[in-house]
């Protein structure tokens, strides 16, 4: 415990809040190139083959990003837009790929929540 005199001389240090999306460097999204597209299995009570991609961002950081939605057209060297947002059952996956931008196509036959998956409105 510091004395009053020590506090007058030095003061207290402010806590620095650590960002959850450090690789984006403060940007809302970042462009990147897929270096590897693969599937991985989730943590314990869940079971699936989750689609993820290793992405080298323009900030020269390589991150693992989740590919949301059913089906995708991504492969190595695809240009993608990455946003923050973790996937709870995939350890180490703290970013998501934005569907319907750059080389990523939107989800086919999507009727609801279309804007999240880059799906165009169906002609009726």
UniProtKB/Swiss-Prot annotation:
Presence of the UniProt keyword Ribonucleoprotein in the record: yes
Subunit and partners: Part of the 30S ribosomal subunit. Contacts proteins S8 and S17. May interact with IF1 in the 30S initiation complex.
Protein keywords: Ribonucleoprotein, Ribosomal protein, RNA-binding, rRNA-binding, tRNA-binding
Metal-binding recorded as keyword: no
Single Gene Ontology MF annotation: rRNA binding
Function of the protein: With S4 and S5 plays an important role in translational accuracy. Interacts with and stabilizes bases of the 16S rRNA that are involved in tRNA selection in the A site and with the mRNA backbone. Located at the interface of the 30S and 50S subunits, it traverses the body of the 30S subunit contacting proteins on the other side and probably holding the rRNA structure together. The combined cluster of proteins S8, S12 and S17 appears to hold together the shoulder and platform of the 30S subunit.
Listed transmembrane segments: none
GO BP terms: translation
Name this protein carries in UniProt: Small ribosomal subunit protein uS12
Family of this protein: Belongs to the universal ribosomal protein uS12 family.
Region feature (Disordered): 9-32, 105-124
GO CC, one annotated term: small ribosomal subunit
InterPro entries, alphabetized: NA-bd_OB-fold, Ribosomal_uS12, Ribosomal_uS12_bac
PROSITE patterns: RIBOSOMAL_S12
Start-end of Basic residues biased regions: 108-118
């Amino acid at each position: 415990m510091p004395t009053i005199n020590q506090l007058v001389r030095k003061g207290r240090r402010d806590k620095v809040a650590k960002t959850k999306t450090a690789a984006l460097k403060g940007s809302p999204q970042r462009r990147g190139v897929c270096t590897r597209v693969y599937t991985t299995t989730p943590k314990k009570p869940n079971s699936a083959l989750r689609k993820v991609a290793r992405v080298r961002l323009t900030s020269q950081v390589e991150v693992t990003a989740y590919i949301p939605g059913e089906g995708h057209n991504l492969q190595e060297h695809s240009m993608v837009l990455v946003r923050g947002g973790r996937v709870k059952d995939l350890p180490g996956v703290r970013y998501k790929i934005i569907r319907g931008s750059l080389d990523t196509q939107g989800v086919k036959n999507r009727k609801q929540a279309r804007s999240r998956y880059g799906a165009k409105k169906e002609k009726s």
